[in-house]
Amino acid sequence: MTPPAISLVLPVYNQADHIAGVVESYVPVLRRVGGEFEIVLVTNACRDASPEVCAQLAAEHPEIRTLDLVQGGWGRAVRAGLALTTGETVGYTNSARTTPEILALCAAYARAYPDMVIKANRRIRDNWSRRFGSLLYNLECRALFDLPTWDINGTPKFFPRAYSDLLALQRDDDLIDAEFVALCRRRGYPMAEVPVLSTRRHGGTSTTNYGSALKMYRGAVELRRRMDGGR
């Protein structure tokens, strides 16, 4: 069986009120860009009807698969979804913030440049505190990992399946994006960023707060130490 051109992983957390509409809007976009495609929906520690909604989507679309995780975590959901993908071009994104237009743009770049890692670079934040917190985090990661990017957490992220190290990420938390970008830098995977001008949420509430932000600042240092072999 020929593998699909594009595999897209969508972590889902308490998004029962809008995930069906989001996924339905992605289907024609991926079909137009890649032809054959697959979507892997990963519900994680949901307290609403997201698993049932995703199961219904999978029943209605042969291109969609779903996986329900008892434990939560952005990284855990991304990793579990990546493990199920079979496509030539693999990607993941924040389904609460990614419009069909943004997805189409990043996916088209990934298909046009099959040896490149493609990621979004979000140019707008919700408010000044998020902008400032993001700036601090990105400055920290740039210094720790010698990175050129200004938006570590920006999604969509797409990469060729041949870059297999990106299919074996280790973080179960929000640090998975820093791990992704740092690994690209260390392995010499070429990366291009696509400016994204919209960050409105389809629905739901961001789980980022001051506590989680501080955890990410500390976690970036721990990630650097682990990637250096524990030094």
Predicted stretch roles:
Residues 4-10, 19, 26, 37-42:
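Hydrophobic targeting segments
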Residues 15-19, 46:
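Donor nucleotide-sugar binding loop of glycosyltransferases
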Residues 37, 51-84:
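Conserved donor nucleotide-binding strand/loop of the catalytic core
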Residues 38, 63-65, 148, 190-192:
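Conserved beta-strand segments of alpha/beta enzyme cores
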Residues 43-52, 97:
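A conserved acidic beta->alpha catalytic loop
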Residues 69-72, 76-84, 89-92, 100-174, ...:
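Acceptor/aglycone-binding surface of glycosyltransferases and processive sugar-polymer synthases
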